UniProtKB/Swiss-Prot annotation:
Its main location: cytoplasm. It comes from Anoxybacillus flavithermus (strain DSM 21510 / WK1). The lineage of its organism: Bacteria, Bacillati, Bacillota, Bacilli, Bacillales. Fourteen ClpP subunits assemble into 2 heptameric rings which stack back to back to give a disk-like structure with a central cavity, resembling the structure of eukaryotic proteasomes. Cleaves peptides in various proteins in a process that requires ATP hydrolysis. Has a chymotrypsin-like activity. Plays a major role in the degradation of misfolded proteins. It catalyses: Hydrolysis of proteins to small peptides in the presence of ATP and magnesium. alpha-casein is the usual test substrate. In the absence of ATP, only oligopeptides shorter than five residues are hydrolyzed (such as succinyl-Leu-Tyr-|-NHMec, and Leu-Tyr-Leu-|-Tyr-Trp, in which cleavage of the -Tyr-|-Leu- and -Tyr-|-Trp bonds also occurs). It is found in: Cytoplasm. GO terms for cellular component: cytoplasm; endopeptidase Clp complex. This is ATP-dependent Clp protease proteolytic subunit. InterPro entries: ClpP, ClpP/crotonase-like_dom_sf, ClpP/TepA, ClpP_His_AS, ClpP_Ser_AS. It comes from the Bacteria.
Amino acid sequence: MNLIPTVIEQTSRGERAYDIYSRLLKDRIIILGSPIDDHVANSIVSQLLFLAAEDPEKDISLYINSPGGSITAGMAIYDTMQFIKPDVSTICIGMAASMGAFLLAAGAKGKRFALPNSEIMIHQPLGGVQGQATEIEIAAKRILFLRDKLNRILSENTGQPIEVIERDTDRDNFMTAEKAKEYGLIDRVLTRVDEK
């Protein structure tokens, strides 16, 4: 059962009921709280574009609690974050794994955060394919290309040499918030909301 809380707001014109995500969007907060697929990516991209059009000078906060997901869907979010004018601040709540960690590190420099008990995990892309040998070869080349592209971007966003990224993403690599800060995935560990 998917229950989305409703918030009642008192205004000079009376009461207004919002679902919680719409109310947070009013404060330029976007929640990525699920595996990343095309539907989730379209929703996040739409919210980013809407907020950028509404006020191109004001930061957007993207809260991430995601196990990761589709590379192409995640890259749609990543490209939009880079494309729009407002800075996108990223905040890990719970877990940012795989593509979730990639998006966390892609936030505006100096504005990438995690809460103290967050967990961040990086690894190489996963994929599976079946079919004729030629199809398998094409798919293998594509996933190696994607791995190299993701590693290069992660290297740029963390300041880690590409060789370190390649080694550290060879297997699931779990980090505490503090370790993610040392690694360069985030800039600060937050304990209170007013620290941002």
